[in-house]
């Protein structure tokens, strides 16, 4: 996934991957992580997700990383949140009371920024990468997360040959094969969400499974 591709999607507002509501799996399963209210939570490739507002409402300190500047700016403007902007290395840092967003490349995000996180949430990051780059991202996520940190991973799976991503199809087998070295993996739920995704229906995708996993960094 080239940076230019992602920037173009946001510039043209072709952001079908953006959810207008908080993810139901997040609402249902977040409490199973049993994290304290003041825990720091890392959200990779966060976009302008409302899920970050949900996490902040639980009392958490949210640390997000997003490549596209427009996505970050829209998060604060859409939610009417005041923010302060500063440069931090090669990343731009946007800060409000409980949410800090770092705009830039996740592969160059300093490990020091996530050194104190105890939780993480990946709904749109892993599935944003084509298979050729996905394992590299998974290793970078593991590098950024402290040992013992826990989080939720949400994936989509469908016949990839029917529709090109993003979001890309990530199977349970891929998750187990590529993440088990760095994470303990506990599948929590899986459901067919085809009816809720008109783009996939229009392209005659026969099924679309959304799954949620509880991960713990080894």
UniProtKB/Swiss-Prot annotation:
* Pfam families to which the protein is assigned, alphabetical: TPMT
Per the record, its GO cellular-component terms are: cytoplasm
Q: Does the keyword RNA-binding apply?
A: no
Q: Which domain of life is it from?
A: Bacteria
Q: Does the keyword Methyltransferase apply?
A: yes
- Cell compartment(s), UniProt: Cytoplasm
Q: What general EC class does the enzyme of this chain belong to?
A: transferase
What family is it from?
Belongs to the class I-like SAM-binding methyltransferase superfamily. TPMT family.
Q: What is the recorded name of this protein? A: Thiopurine S-methyltransferase
Species = Shewanella oneidensis (strain ATCC 700550 / JCM 31522 / CIP 106686 / LMG 19005 / NCIMB 14063 / MR-1)
GN (gene name): tpm
